[in-house]
Structures are given as C-alpha cells and as structure tokens.
Design a protein with these regions (language model features):
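Helix-biased detector of long, well-ordered alpha-helical tracts
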Residues: 1-200
Length: 200
C-alpha cells in the first residue's frame, strides 16, 4: 500500500497482451450487473481474445462530486467479485473527482495484461472463406437490458445483461480446438460489425 505502481511477475521468455478500455454507461446499474462488472469483463475479454492468460488489471475512476458512496462501494465490490470470477488480480488503481456536472456519475477505465502462450497467434486476419463462426450465447441481451432501464421499457420476460468474463471459456476452446483462428468479444456494432471486420 502507498506505492505509485503495482509490480507483477511476467514471463521471462514470451509475449504479453495488453488492452485498455473506458466505460461510460447510463444507467450505471442495470439488470444483471453494473458499470463495475462491465469494466472488468470488457478488458478481461479483450485481452483473452488474443489467447492470453489474463493475469492483472488496473482501474481508474472518474467520479462526479457528490456521487453516493454506497453506490461506489457496490461498484467496487462487484469489480472485486468479477475479478475473482475471472481469476485475475486488480493490482493498481486511481481515483479522480471532477466538479458536479462534469461527469455522468462515474466513469471507469481498466487496463489488462496477460501472457500469450507460445505458438498462439489469434487474429481476425487469419479468417478464411468457409470458416465456421461460433457464437457463445444469445445476442442483444446486454444492450436490451440497458435500453430497457434507460427508456423505461417493460418486457413480458426479465432480460438481464449477459456480461461475463470469457477467459476460461476461451482457454477451454483453445485446448479443444488449438487451430482456432480468432476470437472476438462483440460490443458496439454487435455481431454484424464483427463479421464485417472478418470479411475485410
């Protein structure tokens, strides 16, 4: 505690994968999660799609003056639980407060680092015509869960965000199918944008 940097072990001979993302979502709490779960899952998944064993995260908060402490505690607790679920450590962080009206409650940035095993070279550039595309779950749950809260929409069934760390799933797929060409965690633009990227 009290240090300016987190120190972590990395492979002596090998490659690392690193990704960073900033999370701005309204509302910050929604069915199935909150902005804290998104912040951990989003970066864990981005690093994991390289085939890396995700090890460490950093997190930075930008808080609007007057943001309720009980909500902040809930977000931080969710981040800790999600990191534990993913098997990663949050080793450093920072908090800044901006004037009232200078932010929409809370923004979170996370960065992640992982070790890429030897021989793993996953990339959308590897895709070829005729490749099979596998989808790990239903489409649109997260977006609809947030939209329903934001717009006050009611549905006949409960719709929850499916945000989850996918690093263990990716590792299992690679173990079973080591010739897998690439992985993606579709976010903005969804599956259609991802497939368009592959086609290009």
């Amino acid at each position: 505690a009290g240090n300016d940097a987190g120190v972590a072990a990395l492979p002596a001979n090998g490659r690392i994968a690193m990704s960073t993302d900033s999370f701005v979502v309204t509302p910050q709490f929604f069915p199935g999660g909150n902005i804290g779960r998104l912040a951990v899952c989003g970066t864990v998944n981005d690093v994991a799609t390289s085939g890396a064993n995700v090890r460490y995260l950093s997190c930075g908060f930008i808080l609007e003056e007057g943001y309720p402490m009980d909500k902040l505690r809930q977000i931080v607790q969710t981040m800790a639980e999600t990191a534990h679920e993913a098997g990663v450590s949050i080793i450093t962080g920072d908090t800044k407060v901006v004037e009232r009206g200078g932010a929409d409650g809370v923004y979170i940035n996370t960065a992640g680092v992982g070790e890429v095993p030897a021989g793993v070279t996953l990339s959308g550039a590897n895709c070829r015509p005729g490749d099979a595309i596998l989808v790990s779950g239903t489409l649109g749950d997260h977006g609809i869960a947030i939209m329903s809260q934001r717009e006050g929409l009611a549905f006949s069934s409960d719709i929850e965000s499916d945000a989850a760390p996918l690093n263990h799933l990716i590792a299992d797929v690679l173990a079973a199918a080591p010739d897998t060409r690439c992985f993606r965690d579709p976010t903005r633009g969804g599956l259609a944008s991802t497939l368009n990227e592959f086609a290009q």
